[in-house]
Amino acid sequence: MAAEDVVATGADPSELEGGGLLHEIFTSPLNLLLLGLCIFLLYKIVRGDQPGASGDNDDDEPPPLPRLKRRDFTPAELRRFDGVQDPRILMAINGKVFDVTKGRKFYGPEGPYGVFAGRDASRGLATFCLDKEALKDEYDDLSDLTPAQQETLSDWDSQFTFKYHHVGKLLKEGEEPTVYSDDEEPKDETARKNE
């Protein structure tokens, strides 16, 4: 009677006898391959990019530099922080100076944005121009940027503020640097003299 039920339902007798899903997975090479791929991807997701987990240093990156104390820079002082003269890489955006050393692959000498290292990158980022000619050697007040370019620059400023350490500001010629205390709160030079 059981054989008649199988014939009546149209089911394959081997499916009813075996392990069902497990039988399907382990008897098909394609399913085995997909299962292996799923396990590998799950392992990569769970394990993630744990630093030092593999025991080797893939990129031969130098050890991280200590955090730079907050200070202000003239365009000439900023220029030496290009990743060549000094291992640290600084960039100015919208009057703010950021330590972008951890982004060496992008902003280092061989990176796609290496032209901005040690410079005020505001004009280049606002105009989407990676030419060295777009950058000025002296302080750039950016007064000739269009509203759309100013908005683009503001977006870059927000991204850098979120991602990189803000180490100070870019000084105009003749501007006095801000004195920063150990807790990195700015104090004007005149307020400091009155104490």
Swiss-Prot record:
<dbReference type="GO" id="GO:0140077">
    <property type="term" value="P:positive regulation of lipoprotein transport"/>
</dbReference>
<feature type="binding site" description="axial binding residue">
    <location>
        <position position="113"/>
    </location>
    <ligand>
        <name>heme</name>
    </ligand>
</feature>
<dbReference type="GO" id="GO:0043005">
    <property type="term" value="C:neuron projection"/>
</dbReference>
<feature type="domain" description="Cytochrome b5 heme-binding">
    <location>
        <begin position="72"/>
        <end position="171"/>
    </location>
</feature>
<keyword id="KW-0479">Metal-binding</keyword>
<keyword id="KW-0654">Proteoglycan</keyword>
<comment type="function">
    <text>Component of a progesterone-binding protein complex. Binds progesterone. Has many reported cellular functions (heme homeostasis, interaction with CYPs). Required for the maintenance of uterine histoarchitecture and normal female reproductive lifespan. Intracellular heme chaperone. Regulates heme synthesis via interactions with FECH and acts as a heme donor for at least some hemoproteins. Forms a ternary complex with TMEM97 receptor and low density lipid receptor/LDLR, which increases LDLR-mediated LDL lipoprotein internalization.</text>
</comment>
<dbReference type="GO" id="GO:1903078">
    <property type="term" value="P:positive regulation of protein localization to plasma membrane"/>
</dbReference>
<feature type="topological domain" description="Cytoplasmic">
    <location>
        <begin position="44"/>
        <end position="195"/>
    </location>
</feature>
<dbReference type="GO" id="GO:0099563">
    <property type="term" value="P:modification of synaptic structure"/>
</dbReference>
<feature type="topological domain" description="Lumenal">
    <location>
        <begin position="1"/>
        <end position="24"/>
    </location>
</feature>
<feature type="modified residue" description="Phosphothreonine">
    <location>
        <position position="74"/>
    </location>
</feature>
<dbReference type="GO" id="GO:0046872">
    <property type="term" value="F:metal ion binding"/>
</dbReference>
<comment type="subunit">
    <text>Homodimer. Forms stable homodimer through hydrophobic heme-heme stacking interactions. Interacts with PGRMC2. Interacts with FECH; the interaction results in decreased FECH activity. Interacts with EGFR, CYP1A1 and CYP3A4; the interactions require PGRMC1 homodimerization. Interacts with TMEM97 and LDLR; the interaction increases LDL internalization.</text>
</comment>
<keyword id="KW-0256">Endoplasmic reticulum</keyword>
<dbReference type="GO" id="GO:0005741">
    <property type="term" value="C:mitochondrial outer membrane"/>
</dbReference>
<dbReference type="InterPro" id="IPR036400">
    <property type="entry name" value="Cyt_B5-like_heme/steroid_sf"/>
</dbReference>
<dbReference type="GO" id="GO:0005789">
    <property type="term" value="C:endoplasmic reticulum membrane"/>
</dbReference>
<keyword id="KW-0472">Membrane</keyword>
<feature type="modified residue" description="Phosphothreonine">
    <location>
        <position position="190"/>
    </location>
</feature>
<dbReference type="InterPro" id="IPR050577">
    <property type="entry name" value="MAPR/NEUFC/NENF-like"/>
</dbReference>
<dbReference type="GO" id="GO:0005496">
    <property type="term" value="F:steroid binding"/>
</dbReference>
<keyword id="KW-0408">Iron</keyword>
<dbReference type="Pfam" id="PF00173">
    <property type="entry name" value="Cyt-b5"/>
</dbReference>
<dbReference type="GO" id="GO:0020037">
    <property type="term" value="F:heme binding"/>
</dbReference>
<dbReference type="GO" id="GO:0043025">
    <property type="term" value="C:neuronal cell body"/>
</dbReference>
<feature type="modified residue" description="Phosphoserine">
    <location>
        <position position="181"/>
    </location>
</feature>
<keyword id="KW-0754">Steroid-binding</keyword>
<protein>
    <recommendedName>
        <fullName>Membrane-associated progesterone receptor component 1</fullName>
    </recommendedName>
</protein>
<dbReference type="GO" id="GO:0006783">
    <property type="term" value="P:heme biosynthetic process"/>
</dbReference>
<feature type="modified residue" description="Phosphoserine">
    <location>
        <position position="54"/>
    </location>
</feature>
<dbReference type="GO" id="GO:0008306">
    <property type="term" value="P:associative learning"/>
</dbReference>
<keyword id="KW-0597">Phosphoprotein</keyword>
<keyword id="KW-0812">Transmembrane</keyword>
<comment type="similarity">
    <text>Belongs to the cytochrome b5 family. MAPR subfamily.</text>
</comment>
<keyword id="KW-1000">Mitochondrion outer membrane</keyword>
<keyword id="KW-0325">Glycoprotein</keyword>
<dbReference type="GO" id="GO:0005576">
    <property type="term" value="C:extracellular region"/>
</dbReference>
<keyword id="KW-1133">Transmembrane helix</keyword>
<feature type="region of interest" description="Disordered">
    <location>
        <begin position="173"/>
        <end position="195"/>
    </location>
</feature>
<dbReference type="GO" id="GO:0045202">
    <property type="term" value="C:synapse"/>
</dbReference>
<keyword id="KW-0675">Receptor</keyword>
